[in-house]
Amino acid sequence: MKLTFLGADREVTGSCTQLEAAGHRILIDCGMEQGRDVYENTELPYAPGTYEALLLTHAHIDHSGRIPYLYKNGYRGPVYTTEATRDLCGIMLEDSAHIQEQEAEWKNRKAMRSGAEMIEPDYTVEDAQNVMKQFVPCPYEAWQTLFDGPQGRIEVRFTDVGHLLGSASISLRITEAGRAPEIIVFSGDIGNRHQPLIRDPANPGHADYLVMESTYGDRSHGPKPDYLGELSGILQSTFDKGGNVVIPSFAVGRTQELLYFIRQIKAEGRIKGHGNFPVFVDSPLASKSTTIFRENFAECYDEEALALVQSGENPLQFPGLYISETKEQSVAINGDETPKVIISAAGMCDAGRIRHHLKYNLWRPECTVLFVGYQSPGTLGNALVNGAQEVKLFGEPVQVRARIAQLGGLSGHADKDGLEEWLRAFDEKPKFVFVNHGEDAVAEHWADHLKSEGYEAEAPYNGSIWIAAEGRVACAEVGNTRKILRTKTAAAVRTSAAYDRLYNMGQRLLEVIRHNQGGANKDLSKFAGQIAALCDKWDR
């Protein structure tokens, strides 16, 4: 078999690996790169239409986000994945396509003014909708034949890896003519143990060769936090002051975890004097994904959540829960003075409805803004968690008088101990481990650690090619070792953070422009003139 590493190698986004075996050519994941590149990217070696199958570990955009691009450029083969992943991709890829179209529209308006070349979005909503017809849902733990011909046989099996609803590691059993069967396992993103709702990561049992993620291969999450206790304390103290708890949250995964926690808090009567406090989920994507979480319980829920379902309870439903679908419903939330929880996207506060809720609540000392996920440098969320005293929302300065809090320990990725526990569960050591999906130093560290434990291991570069057969592995091509981004020095880190902030302010400006649609022509002309002057000053 021949492996070509095409993405998320010594990086953490853009997952994609090409496998050629038994006369067939397939892809494992086809994700979108997000954030800054570190290494030169490698394009697909072959035209999209020449691939015969695509196997998908889970729905996150850094693993699935370029699948509509493949379709747009001729791919018509099957996309094998779990049922829950298929369902989530149905909403997430369309949402991604909508963003692509909006960005292309904005860039083309600028191009028309300057005479520059027009661009097309990477893919459209129609592409995202059409590629869903290629998805083939597969159950967990069942071998299925992909190909069976004169050059050999390839079978696939999905194993729950506990990262996201429907996430899986992928085992491929490959029988090439004249050789004994061998199994290669692609770990996908390995989940953190004891996450709410979904099952803990399971091990596939056997691997001759392993492609393994290393996101947190250099750190430990520490003791499991008391999520219910911490969250209950924040709700109680805020409600007692008459304030709201505003939670910026990622629409898929984290929002559902929060609903699970709040249901339990209400069921146990932990909040005194505010027992029926309202909870608003204000994100169309979160609303759709919550419905999918509710429908995919049989294969994906852990024992505790499944027991609730079997007893007639919905783990994501409780009295006082309201889902806001329309803009009018969203606006009405802040017209009610009852202390409440508001969960809204985007998780880093640089777009979406959350910015409206921050505008109405940040200046109120009785309120709390609770962060439940990583906040990237340069984002509004990062500024708030780092103590900003004033921020701008829709062009207006807003004083930060609300309490800023963080619910630590929530992570969908296993730490180094979780990775090691998962690895040691194989029936015997894999003959070779390829380490991917980790920042450069982390992937290198995890590969070195595995070597110290007696494994044969390497962290391949983007574009590297490896040949594996009968337990032996050889590197045929090293790949792209040249870095295009160096951010190790303190000065470089500061520069990078400044650029991130500049970029995010540009995104915010777009939102402000949309917010002013329908305004007086005089005001809009003045606004446009100010932007033009700013562009003329800095376009150099």
Model-based region annotation:
Residues 196-211, 297-305, 375-401:
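Short, compositionally biased "basic patch" segments
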Residues 392-423:
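Generic long, charged, amphipathic alpha-helical segments
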Residues 364, 438-482:
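C-terminal, active-site-flanking charged/polar segments
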Residues 234-380, 392, 427, 442-444, ...:
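Hard-cation-handling environments
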Residues 1-55, 60, 64, 71-257, ...:
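His/Asp/Glu-rich metal-coordinating catalytic cores
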Residues 237, 463-526:
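Charged, amphipathic alpha-helical linkers/stalks
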Residues 49-51, 73-76, 237-246, 334-339, ...:
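Short, surface-exposed connector motifs at secondary-structure boundaries
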Residues 150-158, 292-300, 420-421, 470-481:
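Short, surface-exposed amphipathic charged segments that create phosphate/polyanion-binding patches used
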